[in-house]
C-alpha cells in the first residue's frame, strides 16, 4: 500500500496542473446538496467541458501556494468546497454554477480565479450573467447585418416607388 504522503503529493500535483491549464477555477460551497443534485451538476459541467472536483481544502491551499495564488487561504477555503475548472470558456463554470444555484439555493459561490485574476463571489455572479461567446458573436453579427438589410429595403422601396410613378 502506498503511503498517504505520496497520494497527497499526487493530488496536489493534479490540482496544480488543473490550475495552470484552466482559464477559470471557481470555488463553490456545496453543503446541503443531495447526491442526486451533485450528480446532476456534474453532468451539466461535463457537457460544457468543465471539470468539477472535490478536494481537501489543505491540498488545494498547498497547490494554490505552489502556483502563486495567495487568495485560496485559510479564511476562504473552509467547509465543504468543490472547484469547477473551465478550459475553453472562462465564464462557463460561473454560468453553470449560477444557473444551478438558481434552483438549488443551498449552494453558494465563494470565489474564483479567471484568467489569472482573483474575483470574489459578487464579481463571479456578475461574470456569470455575461452571455456565452456564441451569443455575443450572434448579437454582433445581427447588429452588423441590420444596416445592410435596412439599406436593401430602402433601395427596394425606392425602386418600387419609381416603378409606380412610371406607370402613372
Curated annotation (Swiss-Prot):
SUPFAM superfamilies tied to this protein: Ribosomal protein L10-like
Q: Which UniProt keywords apply?
A: Ribonucleoprotein, Ribosomal protein, RNA-binding, rRNA-binding
Instruction: Supply one GO CC term from the record.
Output: large ribosomal subunit
Q: Name one GO biological process term.
A: translation
**Could you tell me which NCBIfam families the record lists for this protein?**
PRK00099.1-1
Q: How does it assemble?
A: Part of the ribosomal stalk of the 50S ribosomal subunit. The N-terminus interacts with L11 and the large rRNA to form the base of the stalk. The C-terminus forms an elongated spine to which L12 dimers bind in a sequential fashion forming a multimeric L10(L12)X complex.
> In which family does this protein belong, per the annotation?
Belongs to the universal ribosomal protein uL10 family.
Summarize the protein's role.
Answer: Forms part of the ribosomal stalk, playing a central role in the interaction of the ribosome with GTP-bound translation factors.
The protein here is known as Large ribosomal subunit protein uL10
Q: What is the lineage of its organism?
A: Bacteria, Bacillati, Bacillota, Clostridia, Peptostreptococcales
Its gene name is: rplJ
Amino acid at each position: 500500500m502506498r503511503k498517504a504522503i505520496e497520494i497527497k503529493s499526487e493530488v496536489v500535483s493534479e490540482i496544480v496542473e488543473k490550475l495552470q491549464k484552466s482559464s477559470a477555477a471557481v470555488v463553490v460551497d456545496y453543503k446541503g446538496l443531495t447526491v442526486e443534485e451533485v450528480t446532476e451538476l456534474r453532468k451539466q459541467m461535463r457537457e460544457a467541458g468543465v471539470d468539477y472536483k472535490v478536494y481537501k481544502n489543505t491540498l488545494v491551499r498547498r497547490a494554490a501556494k505552489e502556483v502563486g495564488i495567495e487568495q485560496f487561504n485559510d479564511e476562504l477555503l473552509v467547509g465543504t468546497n468543490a472547484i469547477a475548472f473551465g478550459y475553453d470558456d472562462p465564464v462557463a463554470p460561473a454560468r453553470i454554477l449560477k444557473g444551478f444555484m438558481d434552483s438549488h439555493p443551498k449552494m453558494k459561490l465563494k470565489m474564483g480565479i479567471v484568467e489569472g485574476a482573483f474575483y470574489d463571489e459578487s464579481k463571479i455572479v456578475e461574470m456569470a450573467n455575461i452571455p456565452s461567446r456564441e451569443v455575443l458573436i450572434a448579437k454582433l453579427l445581427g447588429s452588423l447585418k441590420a444596416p445592410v438589410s435596412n439599406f436593401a429595403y430602402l433601395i427596394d422601396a425606392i425602386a418600387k416607388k419609381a416603378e409606380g410613378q412610371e406607370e402613372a
